[in-house]
């Protein structure tokens, strides 16, 4: 009977939306449900989702800030076209329920589901409500959230995390017998972050052999960052464009320096890894800052605003911590984790389908 039930996941744009959706998809498939995916052809989901054996179809939709007059004028037209495309796909696939996991595609996808009479469930990963989910919550049968207090009456489930990350050993096991320089993992999202790429090599020069760095640079700054490390004669650091096995990187690290996307914050909490967060400054609602606050309040992380993120500031912060302190911070991070988020999101869907 379950095999006849079909769930359409709508998510795209970044790993922060796609990876939680894939975690839920994997769980549902393992429990006998059919999963299909609605995304965009020019973003990460177009390559990632098919690797998991999931059928995916695409609509055309982009994000606009809407500041310019001509953008404001044509944006409704493009949104209506995207909704039309999504409706055609929904009528073709005939899903029993739609799960919106965020990204620009989720707006037209969610509205198309509602206008087609298909039940919609949405999940908000960030601590601050996104504009799309704010509107979609009006039409949704269930609203789920990754952080407490985002929506006033939503169900708190946490953010679904990949199984490989859930399997990372706890901090006490990882730190046992660990000696040598402090291991610093630097991640600025899949595209890298220019402020981290610019500042971290200068920090490395100041602290020299006190630490070893695994630095995900991204594509754009890669050659410049390689040159910066060569200039200071520190060739022992690991400099890469992208880290394929993030679970291995988390297990290796003593501390993370990164942006504060919702998924990164949730993964850090699950793994138990202290962090220095440098929130992205171009979100009007400062969502990354607020994502990081629970870990800061737990004593597991620090926030350095981008304007204050200098090699002197971050060097002083790292020098003030030893491995014993970092291990204690890691345990505090785990104390606020939501390790069962994938199961909780999936069970909400399954229970609704039983009605």
From Swiss-Prot:
**Compartments reported by the entry:** Cell inner membrane
Recorded topology in the membrane: Peripheral membrane protein
Q: What does the UniProt keyword field contain?
A: Cell cycle, Cell division, Cell inner membrane, Cell membrane, Cell shape, Cell wall biogenesis/degradation, Glycosyltransferase, Membrane, Peptidoglycan synthesis, Transferase
The residues listed in the UniProt record as binding UDP-N-acetyl-alpha-D-glucosamine, with positions renumbered to this chain, are 14-16, 126, 162, 190, 243, 262-267, 288
Write down the chemical reaction(s) this protein catalyses. di-trans,octa-cis-undecaprenyl diphospho-N-acetyl-alpha-D-muramoyl-L-alanyl-D-glutamyl-meso-2,6-diaminopimeloyl-D-alanyl-D-alanine + UDP-N-acetyl-alpha-D-glucosamine = di-trans,octa-cis-undecaprenyl diphospho-[N-acetyl-alpha-D-glucosaminyl-(1->4)]-N-acetyl-alpha-D-muramoyl-L-alanyl-D-glutamyl-meso-2,6-diaminopimeloyl-D-alanyl-D-alanine + UDP + H(+)
Assigned EC number? 2.4.1.227
Recorded GO molecular functions are: UDP-N-acetyl-D-glucosamine:N-acetylmuramoyl-L-alanyl-D-glutamyl-meso-2,6-diaminopimelyl-D-alanyl-D-alanine-diphosphoundecaprenol 4-beta-N-acetylglucosaminlytransferase activity; undecaprenyldiphospho-muramoylpentapeptide beta-N-acetylglucosaminyltransferase activity
Q: Which GO BP terms, alphabetically?
A: carbohydrate metabolic process; cell division; cell wall organization; lipid glycosylation; peptidoglycan biosynthetic process; regulation of cell shape
Listed InterPro entries? GlcNAc_MurG (IPR006009), Glyco_trans_28_C (IPR007235), GlycoTrans_28_N (IPR004276)
Q: Name one Pfam family in it.
A: Glyco_transf_28
Keyword Transport attributed: no
Write out the function statement from the record.
Cell wall formation. Catalyzes the transfer of a GlcNAc subunit on undecaprenyl-pyrophosphoryl-MurNAc-pentapeptide (lipid intermediate I) to form undecaprenyl-pyrophosphoryl-MurNAc-(pentapeptide)GlcNAc (lipid intermediate II).
What is the protein's name according to its record? UDP-N-acetylglucosamine--N-acetylmuramyl-(pentapeptide) pyrophosphoryl-undecaprenol N-acetylglucosamine transferase
- Organism name: Blochmanniella pennsylvanica (strain BPEN)
């Amino acid at each position: 009977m379950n095999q006849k039930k079909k769930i359409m996941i709508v998510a795209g744009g970044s790993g922060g939306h796609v990876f939680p959706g894939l975690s839920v998809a994997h769980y549902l498939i393992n429990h006998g449900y059919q999963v299909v995916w609605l995304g965009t052809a020019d973003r990460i989901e177009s390559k990632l989702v098919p690797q998991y054996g999931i059928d995916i179809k695409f609509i055309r939709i982009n994000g606009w800030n809407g500041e310019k007059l001509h953008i404001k004028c044509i944006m409704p037209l493009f949104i209506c076209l995207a909704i039309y495309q999504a409706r055609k796909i929904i009528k073709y696939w005939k899903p029993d329920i739609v799960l919106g996991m965020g990204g620009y595609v989720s707006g037209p996808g969610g509205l198309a589901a509602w206008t087609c009479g298909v039940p919609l469930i949405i999940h908000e990963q960030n601590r601050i409500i996104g504009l799309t989910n704010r509107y979609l919550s009006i039409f949704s049968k269930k609203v789920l959230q990754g952080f407490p207090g985002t929506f006033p009456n939503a169900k708190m489930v946490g953010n679904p995390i990949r199984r490989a990350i859930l399997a990372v050993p706890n901090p006490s096991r990882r730190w046992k017998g660990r000696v040598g320089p402090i291991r610093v993992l630097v991640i600025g999202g899949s595209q890298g972050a220019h402020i981290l790429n610019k500042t971290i090599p200068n920090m490395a020069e100041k602290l020299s052999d006190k630490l070893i760095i695994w630095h995900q640079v991204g594509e754009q700054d890669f050659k410049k960052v390689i040159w910066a490390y060569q200039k200071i004669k520190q060739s022992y650091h690991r400099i890469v464009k992208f880290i394929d096995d993030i679970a291995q990187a988390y297990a290796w690290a003593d501390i993370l320096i990164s942006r504060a996307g919702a998924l990164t914050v949730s993964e850090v909490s699950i793994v138990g890894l202290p962090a220095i967060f440098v929130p992205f400054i171009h979100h009007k609602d400062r969502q990354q800052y607020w994502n990081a606050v629970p870990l800061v309040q737990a004593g597991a992380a620090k926030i350095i605003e981008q304007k204050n993120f200098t090699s002197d500031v971050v060097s002083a912060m790292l020098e003030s911590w030893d491995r014993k302190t970092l291990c204690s911070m890691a345990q505090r991070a785990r104390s606020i984790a939501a390790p069962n988020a994938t199961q909780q999101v999936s069970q909400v869907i399954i229970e609704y389908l039983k009605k």
